[in-house]
Structure formats: C-alpha cells, structure tokens
Amino acid sequence: MPRNDPRLRVGLALVTGAGSGLGRALAIELAGRGLPVAGLGRRADALAETARLAGPDFHAFPCDIADFDALRAAFAKADAIAPLTLLINNAALYPHRDFLDETPESFMATMQVNFGGTLAATRLALDRFVPTGFGRILNVATFADLHPLPTAAAYSTSKGAARTLTRALKADLADRFPDIVITDWMPGMLATTMGIPDGLPPEVSAKWGAELALWHDPALTGATFEQDREILPPQGLKSKLKDALLLRRRTPRAL
C-alpha cells in the first residue's frame, strides 16, 4: 500500500489534545500537508491559537474527551467537514501524584482521559470506518507501563491499558477489516509541559507522527513505532529457530 494513501488525504483527520504540545504540532503538520483537521481540546483559547498557527484547514472543537456525550457531539459536528478517515489519539493527563496521595476518584479521572478518552474516540471512529471498511488510527503511546516512574501510577496504568487496547483491536478486527489500520507510536521525550526541558521539539516529532499516520498498510495494525522506527515484538525460541533455519532476518520498518 502507498505510504501516503490518497484516500486519507481526501478525508478528515481528527486529533485529540490539539490545544498544545504534540497535539498542536501534529495538527499543524497535517494541515500543512493539505488535510482538513478537526482539533479537540478542553480549552477554546488554546485551540484558537492552534487554528491561528495551522491556518484555514484547522477546525476547532472544544471538548473534554472524558465527557463521552460531549465527545459524541464533537465527532458529529466534525462530520460536516469531510468523512473521517484518520484519528490520532493524543490527549493525555500526567498528574504526578504519589499513589498514597491518590483517591479512587483522582486515579479514575486520569484513567477516564488517558484510557477512556482513547477508547471512546476509537469507538466513535470505528462507527465511521466500519461501513466503508477503511480508516486509520494512530495512538500516541509510551512504555510507562513497562517501567513506571514514581508518582506516575495512574498515568502508567492508563497508558498501559491503551496499549493493550491496540492489541485487542487487532485480535477483534484485523481479519474482518484489514483496511482499518491501528498503530501505536511513541514520539520520544519531548520539550513540552508533559515532557522534559531538553527534549525533542514537538514539531520534529510531529513530522514522524504525520508520516506514520498517512502510511496505510494492513501490516501496520498492532505494530509499535518509536520516533521513526518500528520496535519489533519479542520473538519466541521456536520462531527464532525457524528464522535461523530459513536464513531469515527480521528488519524493523522505518519512516
């Protein structure tokens, strides 16, 4: 399949968390490539700034993705722009709280955004993709679940759940809907409010994210990329022996 599938370019790209940081950079990058972009975010003023930077192809929809009724309404309004063909699940919270300072309510509030918002946006996108059998979902992910840091219990748990969702969707959908492609992407440590001061500029990472989002290939469903390169899944002993006997080498894909 082509790296830049024209079917994606005639449809709408929807980016959650488009009011700042990586989400804003992704929206600007996609709009710069000629796609109409719907940007969701909690703050209308922040989305207005994204619109100023992205130009006329960006459409702002203030929305808290933890409010599923509001999210449904935002998707319905975005339908008027163009048929949705690309969803980038980017919105996230990182509250930096010790677990002993968490309450069930505060912990679940993070889960509601980082996992619940991703789940709900994905389900709403699939409502639009399944009738045509075509679509693209890119989930902005991390390895926080594998190596949790102190004061990050809610964040790590929620991001791990979102990565599990990608694999579960592959199991449920890949055989029936091979042209609905779902991939996890790790953008790296960024110089954003959720990142680190000396991190990568989000504008640089957004170029990789946009390139991967516009790469439509059924083989990418369930794959994980870090920055511009695929991370191959662990390989069992039997598979390793088979590859050795057949003189096969696994090669990660790159952008």
Enumerate the language-model features and the residues they cover:
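Conserved glycine-rich cofactor-binding loop
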Residues: 19-20
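Conserved glycine-rich Rossmann-like NAD(P)H-binding loop of the short-chain dehydrogenase/reductase
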Residues: 33-49
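The beta1-alpha1 cofactor-binding region of Rossmann-like NAD(H)/NADP(H)-dependent oxidoreductases
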Residues: 62-73, 104
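Substrate-binding pocket helix/loop in short-chain dehydrogenase/reductase
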Residues: 98-100, 106-108
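Active-site helix of classical SDR
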Residues: 122, 158
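Residue(s) in the substrate-gating loop at a strand-loop-helix junction
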Residues: 142
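C-terminal helical subdomain
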Residues: 180, 184-185, 191-243, 252-253
